[in-house]
Every structure is written in C-alpha cells, then in structure tokens.
A protein has these predicted regions:
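Conserved nucleotide-sugar phosphate-binding/catalytic loop shared by glycosyltransferases and other
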Residues: 28, 33-57
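N-terminal subdomain of nucleotide-sugar transferases
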Residues: 1-38
Length: 57
C-alpha cells in the first residue's frame, strides 16, 4: 500500500494553480494524492491528474 498525502485547500482552483507541481512530485515519489477542497469546476482537473478529490462544504 502506497503512503498517502492529503492536501487541504479552500478551493479546487487554488490547488490546481498553486499546489499542482508539489502534488505531481509527491505522486512521482510514490504517494497516493488526495485533495480536500470546495469542489466546483476544478474537480475534473484534479481527477484528470489521477488524484482523489474530497468535498469540503
């Protein structure tokens, strides 16, 4: 089982614009990447990267 990392940000777009390079590096290092955020238009981008989204309400 791969280690997991959880990014917690307020908005999905913020993750994609500011944390994506770090998340890609974590995945390349063998981590399973999860993202907790308010999910709107950026959800598809998070899923396209192969990361697991979690909705914050």
């Amino acid at each position: 089982m791969a280690p997991r990392i959880l990014y917690v940000v307020t908005e999905d777009w913020y993750f994609l614009s500011h944390r994506l390079p770090m998340a890609r590096a974590a995945e390349a290092a063998g981590y399973e990447v999860h993202v907790a955020a308010r999910l709107k238009d950026g959800r598809a981008g998070i899923e396209k990267e192969g990361f697991t989204p979690h909705a914050l309400h």
